[in-house]
Amino acid sequence: MANSYLSSCANVMVERINTSQELVELCKGKSSSALLKRLKVALVTANPVLADADQRAEHVREVKHWLTGIKDAFFQAEDILDELQTEALRRRVVAEAGGLGGLFQNLMAGREAIQKKIEPKMEKVVRLLEHHVKHIEVIGLKEYSETREPQWRQASRSRPDDLPQGRLVGRVEDKLALVNLLLSDDEISIGKPAVISVVGMPGVGKTTLTEIVFNDYRVTEHFEVKMWISAGINFNVFTVTKAVLQDITSSAVNTEDLPSLQIQLKKTLSGKRFLLVLDDFWSESDSEWESFQVAFTDAEEGSKIVLTTRSEIVSTVAKAEKIYQMKLMTNEECWELISRFAFGNISVGSINQELEGIGKRIAEQCKGLPLAARAIASHLRSKPNPDDWYAVSKNFSSYTNSILPVLKLSYDSLPPQLKRCFALCSIFPKGHVFDREELVLLWMAIDLLYQPRSSRRLEDIGNDYLGDLVAQSFFQRLDITMTSFVMHDLMNDLAKAVSGDFCFRLEDDNIPEIPSTTRHFSFSRSQCDASVAFRSICGAEFLRTILPFNSPTSLESLQLTEKVLNPLLNALSGLRILSLSHYQITNLPKSLKGLKLLRYLDLSSTKIKELPEFVCTLCNLQTLLLSNCRDLTSLPKSIAELINLRLLDLVGTPLVEMPPGIKKLRSLQKLSNFVIGRLSGAGLHELKELSHLRGTLRISELQNVAFASEAKDAGLKRKPFLDGLILKWTVKGSGFVPGSFNALACDQKEVLRMLEPHPHLKTFCIESYQGGAFPKWLGDSSFFGITSVTLSSCNLCISLPPVGQLPSLKYLSIEKFNILQKVGLDFFFGENNSRGVPFQSLQILKFYGMPRWDEWICPELEDGIFPCLQKLIIQRCPSLRKKFPEGLPSSTEVTISDCPLRAVSGGENSFRRSLTNIPESPASIPSMSRRELSSPTGNPKSDASTSAQPGFASSSQSNDDNEVTSTSSLSSLPKDRQTEDFDQYETQLGSLPQQFEEPAVISARYSGYISDIPSTLSPYMSRTSLVPDPKNEGSILPGSSSYQYHQYGIKSSVPSPRSSEAIKPSQYDDDETDMEYLKVTDISHLMELPQNLQSLHIDSCDGLTSLPENLTESYPNLHELLIIACHSLESFPGSHPPTTLKTLYIRDCKKLNFTESLQPTRSYSQLEYLFIGSSCSNLVNFPLSLFPKLRSLSIRDCESFKTFSIHAGLGDDRIALESLEIRDCPNLETFPQGGLPTPKLSSMLLSNCKKLQALPEKLFGLTSLLSLFIIKCPEIETIPGGGFPSNLRTLCISLCDKLTPRIEWGLRDLENLRNLEIDGGNEDIESFPEEGLLPKSVFSLRISRFENLKTLNRKGFHDTKAIETMEISGCDKLQISIDEDLPPLSCLRISSCSLLTETFAEVETEFFKVLNIPYVEIDGEIFS
């Protein structure tokens, strides 16, 4: 399957020979000229048969051997041409540095070097190529020509990823189920977040589904904090914990030890409900998982961790409460997916019938794998001819057992240059996230972007190549900005297959023999010792790439000695890419100067103290990465000789100055930092010659500019390609003295005036500027492209620039203006009082740390100020007391802390100082998405109201009193929500500023309760809380002229009616009746519904007594029905629930008669998820047999419920129930005689059922049962005969006073039991565990509230070899001998055990290390 891109190689080499005058000049000698011609002839002769060789290599051994040989010869020929080009480049550098005499001497030396060094190599390569050319006829290769030009470039214009996000094919039920799991209120994991595992084979769509669910509006509203982390194969607790913390805080975390990180993360998440997704999780280490979970113990109940993984073992290790198994798609779903990506927006009915017939056969061949369907669709997209589809189908039929042939079809359709670029990506480890710049620089270094006769930048060519590969589904983009990407594992396998031996990725210390033909080598630092890895490749003499990757456990710098490096680099003179990043090297080896072909050198995060001058002889060098070299303070003086240098990264490196002559680096495209020296070094004028600079340029130490005229010489105004500019002064000493407007300050103003950039600039930042005012250009409307401005630490400024006239400005941050007192009209209009609309695009405005600011004067405008403002943040402005700005948009989120600002000057309404708990870190402010309020004590108070369990969609509102998302005023909340829990906040907030005609976003998750919205409109209101779409200009506030509803990505506005009649679909446009989701609140009549309705949510409709009569017949697509707090609703229409339902959720509907409405003759064959909570007061007997497909059943707080009924003769295969939960049912007495006929039941929870006397009979027969939780069932005394099911993995018995663990339970025989928790109710036990009680498999043991427990029985742990985690809680009489009673453990937690706490208080941390207990936690204090 390899070697599909050689024609690109040949074409490029022939073009180089034809077009490079320098090569011709170098090879003027008779022998070298002849060799160059022979090389060209061999390439031209071999090129036409390469495609034929590709096709036959997979089936004919001789052809495959020939192809491998000529590929190696081609690469050696590339090396020869590169050496010749390097010699020409060297001559050019010497010529520029010397005179005519030097030029003649240089020319003679160059020819001599060619004759002695290069010609012998050239002769060898030419003979090798000619040898392979002679065998073309022998093995029967022929010219290969396509009948037409492939249309891949045209197809790439309409990219699959451009389809509407969130639109699923064949996964609607999966999405609903997973959303319901996340919204459920699961109390199973006491003191820990619940874990949900999404399991499936590679390519089945785990990540895609989880990402869509992660962004679902209900999930976003439900969780206060959401985090997404790509875990990868080499899971590391420290790295992932750090990544989680950085994701939350949106700022760098410098802590370098795990316990401190965990404490910091625990504090950050304390009292918050969070959702964490660990994507592509591989780790099967129990100890790592236990250690990772430590930081989440203080989070709010209902927090969730979601794992996507391909291994069920991983789910067991993580103690997943719910394992969601991803299934393959049906053939119909595969066809829908293929047609969508192959035909774009064309409806299926419009597709050519012949194409459709062939396409459906192809869909069958995809075997239900979405990745395969999408990849093949990308290939078919460029082939509208049925003959092409038939050829694909015919070729496909023999590959039904493997995905790689499916993926290779797309690969075969790529042009040669893209094939070679894709193949190089096989050096990336699976799961490696790479950014656009990283990949393009690597392609450039291997010379894969060369286009003869093209004037385009190499970087632009590379970006196009990357975009085409993304469009063809070879890469998956991780963000909408197209900057981060990942390759699916199957695509990684494909890259490895097509690259063959020429790319080698080492992933462990079992070093195989690396083929001599290998050109590109990578390895994982965590799995491979560097010295071993480097020594293993010395025999690969033609190696071009050495690239180590930072897997999670390798973030700390590693040791690498010159003893290892020198022989390696001496042997590999053909290297183009070399990365030594993060290694603890202090000096570069001299052998580095022999790497004349090197184009990419990464020395970032090393400990080098200087960059030797010989580095400047590497004239091919294009990329030099020196970021975070903390000991490097200068660059070599001869750096100007690197005339091919295109990127110089100096971020985080403390350079004192730039060396003189840097202006000669005219190829430089990106320079991260230009440092101005105090007495020497390059001046600002040298920037003038660097006309191609792009990206963001930082100019540091501007206080060292001696004359303002130097700034003008920088020529920033003539740099149109710069996106961002940072101008930074450094303030020496204590800072400033108020009123000290001296000459220095004036000079700085003049310098800043001269540094006017090009109008195309997008982001601009000024730091520590000490001028008294800003130049006029800053704020000029001609800067139409600026979207972000940050002004920081401008201590002597007494006014702000007129940035209100920047038409595209979206983000403005003004920080630490220590003497500024007034923000006036000039801030909006400038000195000329321009009447252009100020701040017409501004979305975020932040003021921070301005101690003397006391007055804010805003203009009075007809349309209000800041028309697009989404967030206003004012922090640490203690003098600002006067009038709050009027006319803000109604949806603006306002954050105020450490500021006594009054809403109306002299009025009673004000924002009180109680809002000071808002995070004060400047870095964290822009990421805030809601207002956070705290109770007077600063501790959030959670509401104990009932919410959903796994498998059910919950009410959209959340009842955390300390958060709000609503567009209604507080006074408009329904009376039942204005409870004493909320009253405590009214005294703190007062009321909103009176000038807000429609109040800003403020409330605490009372979303959706807007009582003054016309009730007639309610049937067509939006998904919860009516949160405005930022892309839609329509208003959604009460009293406005339009309201919004969401139709799965389609936004529409509905006229606000004034009549009291219910609205019918006929009153609206056709597209509005296509609504799929509808939520209604606070209505008394619900008439007709949208015809295509799939989900109906009825909430808090006290006056609603009935549902639409035609609900059961007229809405065949209705799959989800949620009824919450409808206290007057008594029955379903037609005497039974709709039979089309898959999810039915009923809560707080006491009068609803559920059982009487069920018809014994009717099977509710579609219902899969059923939740009944605090409802149906007449529910006594639940007819389980009427629900054959029910997968999840939860009955909560149903006082009358007593038992289940099973229809006589029901077969064991009839009921599909997988999850059963019964809580707070005080009259539940028994289960059906003979037990539960639920062979698929995997999870069962019984909680607070005071009269329940026994578990189901034949419990042992429930062989699918994996987890069993028995909580607060005081009358259960024994376990049914036969004991527990054999496959049980998790057993929790809590507060069941009469259930005492005994050998008779047969726990010892449970070979799969991993997690055992016994909590309370064991008054007679003084020693635990009894010998022979515990199974060998138990991994985690928790014992709690054993009131009389005095000792641990060492013999009871004798056979428990797997146990790693033990938790002991609430055992006040327990005493143990640390070194004798405890089994070998990885994790030990002790809490509320007074005697044990005293014992361990005397033990040093080192003692635990001696005992081999890596993690010990005692009453929250960590010892490790």
From Swiss-Prot:
InterPro entries: Apaf_helical (IPR042197), Leu-rich_rpt_typical-subtyp (IPR003591), LRR_dom_sf (IPR032675), LRR_R13L1-DRL21 (IPR056789), NB-ARC (IPR002182), P-loop_NTPase (IPR027417), Rx_N (IPR041118), WH-like_DNA-bd_sf (IPR036388). PANTHER family: DISEASE RESISTANCE PROTEIN RGA4, PLANT BROAD-SPECTRUM MILDEW RESISTANCE PROTEIN RPW8. Residues 911-977, 1050-1070 are annotated as: Disordered. GO terms for biological process: defense response to bacterium; defense response to fungus. The LRR repeats probably act as specificity determinant of pathogen recognition. It comes from Arabidopsis thaliana. LRR repeats lie at residues 498-523, 552-571, 572-595, 597-618, 620-641, 642-665, 806-830, 1090-1114, 1118-1139, 1238-1262, 1264-1286, 1310-1336. This is Putative disease resistance protein At3g14460.
